């Protein structure tokens, strides 16, 4: 998910290099998230991340540069990747509810180390919009090849 704050060009370069070196079709988590958002016609987003405020702000800027509006964002403030997996289901659920209050077109859980896939599936009806989990999106991206 690093392309979400480094910029999408990073993933595009990576994919291009991998395909040139291996001749194997290649995808990425963030590009798959964007594909799903486009397929949904979602432009107003709720963004859930485990990151620090500066990283969350960069994600917001990058998505706004792509024409999305970040209607609401919630971040846990962590800076160690291994800690992201220890964020409780209750905390993730509360973050989802917080951003859902802004009535976005879709919610993105942006970090493959956050255990959000089951909650995303379970909470879509509760919050009234699609929830895209980055780990689940990764599996979808690779299933396309």
Question: Where would I find each of the regions flagged by the language model?
Answer:
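Non-catalytic structural scaffold of enzyme domains
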Residues: 1-145
């Amino acid at each position: 998910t690093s392309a979400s704050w480094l910029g999408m060009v990073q993933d595009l370069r990576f994919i291009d290099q991998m395909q040139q070196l291996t001749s194997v079709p290649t995808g990425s988590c963030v590009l798959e998230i964007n594909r799903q958002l486009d397929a949904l016609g979602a432009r107003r987003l709720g963004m859930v991340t485990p990151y620090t405020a500066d990283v969350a702000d960069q994600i917001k800027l990058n998505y706004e540069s792509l024409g999305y509006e970040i209607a609401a964002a919630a971040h846990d403030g962590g800076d160690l990747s291994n800690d992201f997996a220890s964020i409780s289901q209750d905390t993730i659920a509360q973050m989802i509810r917080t951003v859902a209050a802004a009535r976005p077109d879709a919610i993105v859980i942006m970090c493959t180390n956050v255990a959000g896939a089951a909650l995303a599936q379970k909470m879509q009806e509760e919050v009234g919009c699609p929830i895209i989990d980055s780990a689940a999106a990764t599996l979808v991206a690779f299933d396309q090849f």
